[in-house]
Regions:
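Modules that initiate DNA replication and primer synthesis
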Residues: 1-3, 38-66
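Feature primarily recognizes SF3-like P-loop helicase cores of small DNA viruses
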Residues: 1-38, 64-438
């Protein structure tokens, strides 16, 4: 015969003398600490919970005097129950507002709402329209970049505050080393909190699990970009211009579809290049800013980041100003002549076929002339030898010409005839001026 346990009036409602009612505990817990659970991730009013240990600790503090064994397992079970009770549909992707520590900034009219709502990302900085201008930050940027490139950076950092890929760009800041360019990334981590993560562009492209780390992020910072050329670029290009859900993988978990809106901000001593992709699509996705040389007599300030982070509220206003300008310009970035030339220079350095096609003395464009693919490739190899360049393969050389035939007014043909009646491939519109020895 079961012995009835008299209820102690001091016991919480979810404890019945021998066991804890997990559902009742979960409801009481959510009343005290509101949470939502989306796709297995818990959210507080501050945004996604990156580490559940704090929540587990709160559960432990509530139940430890009522559990005599299996405490760890009980805490885990209750946490899973809370996730079920806190289930919520995904938050809408809000591209017209920025959730901040003290409220919501509305982009269309620049108004501010002093209320904290559940959201996908909340930046750990307060909105203060009267915050002073971030003079130390601005001085640092003027010492680091050409003045014409600062508006581009301002617009891009503002762009990273909202979950949008409409700008369809990634940013690279390139220097010789020691200029302090990576300080920008450290300040952004303080400005954006967990909405920004550190990572590697190479890893995102080459490691199938790394792309899942971009979920829920506004920005990924690569503060020391690997200079090795990418063997492929399809994932990077897709993420930069993402307009639909992407397939993500985590170890031991079935792949799933999610919206990814993370932007890339990369710092390095050289630009991002590809072994095989030399298309306009790869290069037009890049904004490349080059730094000024480090003054020989400059003494580095070890407290520079702390000084700039003291201006976070002013830096936020500066970024919002850039975001407004970008939106008003239909997400077309301000690009200086220098920045545009940077992209062209990198494109040429990774594809010397462009320089060859603009060379003199080896061939000329003439509508009523034609040349076989092999003869034209031999002329190109001669140009490479004369200019101490590595030649690309014959297949890639012909492919580059076919992709740019309109640019050079060429016509691809299969009707080039050699002595003996042999018919080969070639191009109409080229007159050879040199004839390399076979």
């Amino acid at each position: 015969m079961k012995k009835n346990i008299s209820r102690n009036p001091l016991w919480p409602d979810w404890y019945h003398g021998k066991k804890i009612d997990e559902v009742q505990f979960g409801r009481a817990f959510l009343e005290q600490w509101p949470l939502k659970c989306i796709n297995g991730t818990l959210y507080t009013l501050d945004g996604p919970v990156e580490d559940e240990s704090e929540i587990k600790q709160r559960i432990l503090e509530n139940i430890e005097e009522y559990v005599t064994s299996g405490l760890s397992k009980k805490v885990t079970n209750i946490l899973e129950t809370i996730k079920l009770l806190a289930f919520s549909d995904p938050f809408p992707i809000e591209q017209d507002c920025v959730h901040l520590q003290n409220g919501v900034y509305h982009l269309p009219d620049g108004s501010f709402q002093e209320s904290r709502l559940f959201c996908q990302n909340r930046l750990p900085v307060k909105y203060d329209p009267k915050a002073p201008s971030p003079e130390r930050w601005l001085t640092f940027l003027h010492e680091l970049l050409d003045d014409a490139d600062i508006p581009t950076l301002q617009e891009y950092l503002g762009y990273c505050l909202i979950p949008s890929t409409k700008g369809q760009k990634m940013m690279l800041i390139v220097g010789k080393g020691g200029e302090g360019k990576s300080r920008i990334g450290l300040v952004l981590k303080r400005l954006m909190g967990d909405a920004a993560s550190n990572g590697s562009v190479q890893k995102v492209e080459n490691n199938r699990f790394a792309r899942a780390d971009l979920e829920r992020r506004l920005l990924m910072i690569d503060d020391d970009m690997d200079m090795n050329a990418l063997p492929k670029t399809n994932y990077i290009k897709t993420i930069v211009t993402a307009e639909a859900k992407l397939d993500l993988e985590r170890k031991g978990v079935q792949s799933y579809q999610r919206d990814i809106y993370a932007r890339f901000l990369c710092f390095g001593n050289g630009a991002l290049t590809s072994l095989y992709d030399h298309s306009d699509g790869f290069f037009r996705r890049q904004l490349i800013l080059t730094t000024k040389d480090k003054p020989a007599d400059r003494t580095d300030d070890p407290f520079l980041v702390e000084k700039m982070c003291a201006e976070l509220e002013g830096i936020l206003l500066w970024c919002l100003e850039g975001l407004h300008r970008l939106v008003q310009n239909d997400f077309r970035f301000t690009v200086s002549e220098r920045a545009a030339a940077n992209v062209d220079t990198i494109k040429r350095s990774s594809n010397n076929v462009i320089d060859f096609m603009e060379s003199e003395g080896y061939f000329r464009f003439k509508a009523d002339y034609s040349i076989s693919s092999k003869e034209f490739y031999d002329i190109y190899k001669l140009w490479c030898e004369d200019n101490a360049c590595h030649s690309v393969s014959a297949i890639r050389f012909s492919a580059e010409l076919r992709q740019n035939d309109r640019r050079y007014n060429l016509e691809t043909t299969n009707n080039i005839y050699l002595p003996g009646g042999r018919r080969v491939r070639g191009f109409v519109g080229i007159e050879p001026l040199v004839h390399p020895c076979p």
